[in-house]
Amino acid sequence: MPEAMTAMDSQDERAQRLVLVTGPSGAGRSTAINVLEDLGYEAIDNLPLSLIPRLLDGPARPMPLALGVDVRNRDFSVANLIELIDRLTRLPEYAPEVLFLDCTTEQLLRRFNETRRRHPLRGEGSPLDAIRAERDMLGPIRARADVLVDTSELSPHDLKAELARWFETEPGRRLTVSVQSFSYKRGVPRGVDMMFDCRFLANPHWRTELRPLDGRDSPVQQYVMADSRFDEFFRRVRDLVLFALPAHLEEGKAHLAIGFGCTGGRHRSVTMAEKMADALAKAGWQVSIRHRELERREKAPAPGDEGHMRAARTAWAQG
């Protein structure tokens, strides 16, 4: 993924950062607003477009601003929003950016069906008709986006990590490193900067006593690390990452994502991720760790219990 190039790059560094958050209903706009608020933005959602200039004419704010805009805004129209974007771009005191949350039509339809929420544009037609109409309506805004994020395969956790890459508010903050394991069968995670394939290492899956365990368990780690290729592989990857981290920090990056993949995302990749996170932390870097497939298993609802899944789906359908 390319480096985050924002409107701020060409404006005075003293200009206040202003993010307009929009996109089709169900793509995660409300979730994005909450994430930006957590990142230190003053977040305001669904303010009528006609009131935004009045808001900005007031006293300077001590923090960057994130404004949620969608078809539910009282006076929303594509022409009005484009006019607002053009007006903001001409103001020297602001550095506006358009964040567009996108999603496939199929995934949007699935989210609305699962949460049973009514699409804001649905009249007599079907939800699919409303989704397509909104997508067509927002086409010109999408074309004007400074940052485009496709949430089709992102969890709320993934979206938070992705937005942190683009909209971190503390440029002096130390670079943080996220290490994650994943299964190639379920697809490569979005937003990974450095990715390493662990499928050549000895596979504990074929050992009956190790199969139900995972790479956080000592017997599995010992088995994987007993592979004669493990030590050199680990050392080379660790040294490469430790070499690259200071360079990324000098370039102004706030976050670096490292992924380790194997077939099932349960044993080899988890072992490598655990060991690498520990090594980087000992080297003084701020590290977080995530095991994507293990999280999916742990969060899977028991038969007949769909409470957790409904909550996750609702988080998307609200925005």
Swiss-Prot record:
Keyword DNA-binding appears in the UniProt entry: no
Family classification: Belongs to the RapZ-like family.
NCBIfam families linked to this entry: PRK05416.1
Name the UniProt record assigns to this protein: Nucleotide-binding protein Pden_2850
Listed GO MF terms: ATP binding; GTP binding
Positions that bind ATP: G23, P24, S25, G26, A27, G28, R29, S30
Residues that hold GTP according to the record: D70, V71, R72, N73
Organism whose genome encodes this protein: Paracoccus denitrificans (strain Pd 1222)
Tagged with keyword Glycosyltransferase: no
Residue ranges, compositional bias (Basic and acidic residues): 296-309
Region Disordered: start-end pairs: 296-319
SUPFAM superfamilies with a match to the protein in the record: P-loop containing nucleoside triphosphate hydrolases
Keywords: ATP-binding, GTP-binding, Nucleotide-binding
Described function: Displays ATPase and GTPase activities.
